Regions:
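A structural signal for multi-pass alpha-helical bundles of membrane permease subunits
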Residues: 2-9, 13-282
């Protein structure tokens, strides 16, 4: 049922694995390296088909300076933070409560309610595109940061509930029973007993949701348009002119847009790993 650890496989498989892994890593990193290199090249290098060669001149400071001073990139970055941070807070807060209810209390409709939360994650985005857009238009939330935040919270709560519910079910139930014997109210059990134990899971889930929402492009172009509300993933396309694209500026903007999720992961790396591995071994 489970894959065999590489240490237990024949020596020939281990050599194959050790040979193919660096190649796969290089293939995965190659596009990222290309974008990073092109972000410091002059615009003429693209016209001269100098895609992988050494830059004809180093224009890193100029390109990154133009990204911040010659475009609306600062506003797009601000919009991304305005969208991502409230979404993370809202989705994680709701999932903590729904996960507690579905993980602790036993009632007849428990599994069906849990199934409703999880089933939404299997609906293709393309099916929801037109109904969600029409809904935001009728509610007056189209092309607003608030509308995008509310949609992301609603859509991400299903996955977050799955994550939190499974984490809470792995906690020692004796702690909750002991608190009930002492006459502690249910909301105090959640706030003072369960929630402190959920900190690693909250940290791991926050990093995941932050990355998901920050990198979202599909709903950014479906529900928003213009500088006032579009996040950075959609705003990068503003470097496309009518007849040509400024690929050197687009590459620099892509590097800038990728930095916040990377910084978020490294700042929360300890808690992220603890949240994913807690309960994996006894």
């Amino acid at each position: 049922m489970f894959p065999t650890p590489i240490e237990r496989t024949p020596r020939s498989w281990q050599i194959t694995y050790q040979t193919l892994l660096p190649l796969a890593l290089i293939l995965w990193l190659l596009p990222l390296i290309a974008v990073a290199i092109f972000s410091v090249k002059p615009d003429a290098d693209f016209a001269n088909a100098n895609y992988w060669g050494w830059p004809s001149s180093f224009e890193g400071f100029t390109n990154y300076g133009l990204v911040f001073t010659g475009s609306d990139m600062p506003q797009y970055l601000l919009n991304s933070f305005k969208i991502t941070i409230p979404t993370v807070i809202g989705a994680v807060a709701l999932s903590c409560m729904t996960g507690f209810a579905l993980g602790i209390y036993k009632f007849r409709a428990n599994i069906w309610i849990f199934f409703m939360f999880v089933a939404g994650n299997f609906v293709p985005f393309q099916i929801l595109m037109v109904p969600v857009r029409d809904l935001t238009l009728h509610l007056g939330l189209y092309n607003t940061i608030t509308g995008l935040v509310l949609f992301h919270i609603a859509f991400q709560t299903g996955f977050c509930t799955l994550f939190m519910r499974n984490f809470i079910r792995a906690l020692p139930f004796e702690l909750i029973e002991a608190a009930r014997v002492e006459g502690v109210a249910e909301w105090r059990i959640f706030w003072f007993v369960v929630l402190p134990l959920m900190k690693p899971a909250i940290a791991a889930l926050s990093v995941l949701i932050f990355t998901f929402i920050w990198n979202d492009y599909f709903w950014a172009i479906v529900l928003t348009q213009g500088v006032e509300s579009q996040p950075v993933t959609a705003g990068i396309t503003s470097f496309n002119a009518q007849y040509r694209a400024a690929y050197h500026l687009m590459s620099a903007g892509s590097i800038v847009a990728a930095l916040p999720p990377v910084a978020m992961f490294f700042m929360m790396q300890k808690h992220f790993i603890a949240g994913l591995t807690l309960g994996a071994v006894k």
